């Protein structure tokens, strides 16, 4: 039998006009990746809306208006005067009413009730959209190989988020607490951003075939990816610190910038009676740390951006430009919040800005790991 030349074996293994299989991400029914990606985009938008609505609920002082956790029957709001009065009577028994809102009437209670009810309802809808989508894709065998655990993880984290939400609310229903515990608020918000980040990463992973991702990873920029990973973690820490600021209303203690009460380091930064609790309960220290971390985040982001400018991939460079623009807007919003004592519109814009910035950091990080190829003609692949 005649021998085949080595080069002939390599070049003729795959017949002309055919393409290699995409692998596990491309497994399943045709178009499954696109359908799952669309479902995840819907979930991403809903979770982002949850974060914004949660911020509005906190800023309007509405978070303790519903004093019970009823995951199923709680979806039905009060429908008559007697039920409304019963809900109001429950609220009147907690410290927030007794110490802060003792002059509140039923009409005012209804306004804060609707904020909290809407926030919880949206959470239930997120759970339903996840469950319906997961069951559908599982039943029709459209979930690509290896993706079932990832999608299940989203559902598990969503369930945990509901339980943590109640754990947070419960902290403000007894004793002398007139708001939820700040560290529980930070836990609740942190998990929300973790879920949002996971969904965003999955959406990006499903935007190309596995074969394309494998090719792209060979051209990935390890140093830039590592630096952006550090930036992502620092941004997450800053988000948690922002929750601590919000939890004790520390943003309104000092309304000057760049100094705090005319000092670079405020005299009230440490209360010896609080000890380690200064980091959670001392408004001066909490705001100071949030400011300093913000400066560090901004400087590090510029360093990462300058490194990204050396990337040979135009799409990657563009992703880092978008990230830096979002950071500049977020810094400006933070300063404006300080100067104007965090009015609701500005404070809400600052929280939405955090969502945008965190998402764009993740996007830039993904492009550093899986850059898009650009042909000689300038087309992106």
UniProtKB/Swiss-Prot annotation:
Keywords from the UniProt entry: Cell membrane, Heme biosynthesis, Iron, Membrane, Metal-binding, Oxidoreductase, Transmembrane, Transmembrane helix
Annotated heme binding sites: 290, 350
Catalyzed reactions: Fe(II)-heme o + 2 A + H2O = Fe(II)-heme a + 2 AH2
The protein's annotated pathway: Porphyrin-containing compound metabolism; heme A biosynthesis; heme A from heme O: step 1/1
GO biological process: heme A biosynthetic process
GO cellular component: plasma membrane
Transmembrane domains' residue ranges: 34-54, 120-140, 151-171, 185-205, 228-248, 285-305, 319-339, 342-362
EC number: 1.17.99.9
Disordered, as annotated region: 1-23
Topological relation to the membrane, as annotated: Multi-pass membrane protein
GO molecular function, one term: oxidoreductase activity, acting on NAD(P)H, heme protein as acceptor
Subunit annotation: Interacts with CtaB.
NCBIfam families hit by this protein: HemSynCtaAAlphapr
Protein name: Heme A synthase
Lineage, broadest ranks: Bacteria, Pseudomonadati, Pseudomonadota, Alphaproteobacteria, Rhodobacterales
Gene name for this UniProt entry: ctaA
């Amino acid at each position: 039998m005649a021998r085949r030349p080595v080069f002939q074996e390599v070049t003729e293994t795959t017949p002309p006009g055919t393409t290699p299989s995409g692998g596990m991400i491309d497994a399943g029914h045709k178009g499954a990746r696109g359908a799952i990606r669309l479902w995840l985009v819907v979930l991403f938008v809903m979770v982002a809306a949850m974060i914004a609505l949660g911020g509005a609920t906190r800023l309007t002082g509405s978070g303790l208006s519903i004093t019970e956790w009823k995951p199923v029957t709680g979806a039905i709001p009060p429908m008559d005067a007697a039920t409304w009065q019963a809900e109001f009577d429950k609220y009147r028994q907690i410290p927030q009413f007794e110490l802060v809102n003792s002059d509140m009437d039923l009409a005012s209670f209804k306004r804060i009730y609707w904020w909290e009810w809407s926030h919880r309802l949206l959470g239930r809808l997120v759970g339903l959209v996840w469950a319906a989508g997961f069951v559908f894709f599982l039943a029709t065998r459209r979930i690509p190989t290896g993706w079932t655990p990832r999608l299940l993880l989203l559902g598990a984290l969503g369930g945990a988020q509901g339980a943590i939400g109640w754990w947070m609310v419960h902290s403000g229903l007894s004793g002398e607490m007139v708001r939820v515990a700040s560290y529980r608020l930070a836990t609740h918000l942190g998990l929300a951003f973790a879920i949002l980040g996971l969904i965003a990463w999955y959406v990006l992973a499903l935007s190309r075939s596995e074969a394309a991702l494998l090719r792209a990873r060979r051209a990935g920029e390890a140093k830039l990816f590592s630096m952006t990973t550090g930036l992502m973690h620092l941004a997450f820490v800053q988000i948690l610190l922002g929750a601590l600021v919000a939890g004790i209303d520390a943003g309104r203690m000092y309304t000057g910038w760049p100094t705090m009460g005319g000092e670079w380091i405020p005299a009230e930064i440490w209360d010896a009676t609080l000890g380690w609790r200064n980091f959670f309960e001392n408004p001066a220290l909490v705001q100071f740390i949030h400011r300093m971390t913000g400066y560090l985040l901004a400087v590090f982001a510029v360093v990462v951006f300058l490194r990204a400018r050396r990337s040979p991939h135009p799409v990657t460079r563009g992703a880092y430009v978008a990230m830096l623009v979002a950071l500049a807007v977020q810094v400006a919003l933070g300063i404006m919040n300080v100067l104007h004592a965090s009015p609701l519109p500005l404070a809400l814009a600052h929280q939405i800005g955090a969502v945008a910035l965190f998402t764009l950091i993740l996007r830039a990080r993904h492009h550093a790991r899986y850059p898009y190829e650009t042909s000689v003609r300038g087309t992106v692949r």
